[in-house]
Design a protein with these regions (language model features):
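Conserved N-terminal catalytic core of the sugar/cofactor nucleotidyltransferase
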Residues: 32-94, 107-108, 147, 152
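Conserved core of the sugar-phosphate nucleotidyltransferase
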Residues: 105-187, 197
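N-terminal nucleotide-binding beta1-loop-alpha1 segment
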Residues: 1-18
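Short beta-strand/turn micro-motifs composed of small residues
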Residues: 9, 53, 99, 128-129
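Short beta-strand-to-loop acidic/aromatic patch adjacent to the donor-nucleotide binding site
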Residues: 93-101
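Active-site glycine-centered loops adjacent to acidic/histidine catalytic or metal-binding residues
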Residues: 11, 101, 188
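Hydrophobic helical membrane-anchoring modules
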Residues: 189-205
Length: 205
């Protein structure tokens, strides 16, 4: 059956200073959410894909009509709240939640994260990236914390046992990944430019 992928695509994207919905910002000539969809579709460990949208992302919801994915409308409050809402509404079991703004993500990275979750034996896993890696790519990072002497920030990728979503505290594995595919998410115009540069560089290899 595999893991259910839940793409979080209902946020306001206020830091972008753009009228375009964040999942529809283009990298490599395609909306960024399409890169995430492709990675999930090709991942061996993903059995189905659900996309969480909101009133803030109506164009994204319309784009998704051409894809074989389920769509759930969430309140559009914030990532964790909307993730919980989607999991409860659809009664999901093992879920990989991922932001819609990771244009470099690929199926190999997705499978690696799921495999790490399955090995760790904990009900939840959060992927983080070191600020050092972010800085090397010219990226910023908010909401960080210290882990084993490193300053890390959430990557916007989580795996959780949806059957335990209502528990206040879950034992959580912290998975540090310093791959650019995980580090590169888009919150500002500058980060969109960096994403395009990295995407074109990868094409030339």
């Amino acid at each position: 059956m595999g893991v259910t992928a839940l793409i979080m695509a209902g946020g306001k994207g206020t830091r972008m200073e753009s009228s375009e919905e964040k999942p529809l910002l283009r990298v490599g000539g395609k909306p960024v959410i399409e890169h995430v969809l492709t990675a999930l579709k090709n991942a061996k460990r993903i059995g189905s894909i659900v996309v969480a949208v909101s009133d803030y992302t109506p164009k994204t919801a319309k784009l998704l009509l051409k894809y074989p994915v389920s769509v759930v409308k969430t309140p559009g409050k914030e990532y964790v709240s909307d993730m919980g809402y989607a999991i409860r509404t659809l009664n999901l079991q093992t879920v990989l939640a991922i932001g819609a703004d990771l244009p470099l993500i690929d199926s190999e990275v997705i499978d690696d994260i799921v495999e790490h979750y399955e090995r760790c034996g904990k009900p939840a896993l959060s992927v983080v990236v070191s600020m050092e890696t972010k800085a090397k790519l010219g990226l910023g990072g908010k909401y960080g914390f210290e882990l084993s002497g490193k300053h890390v920030v959430p990557a916007g990728i989580n795996v959780i046992d949806g059957r335990r979503i209502n528990e206040k505290e879950l034992d959580e594995e912290i998975y540090v990944s310093d791959r650019k595919e995980v580090a590169m998410n888009i919150n500002t115009v500058q980060e969109l430019r960096i994403a395009e540069e990295l995407f074109q560089k990868a094409l030339r290899k």
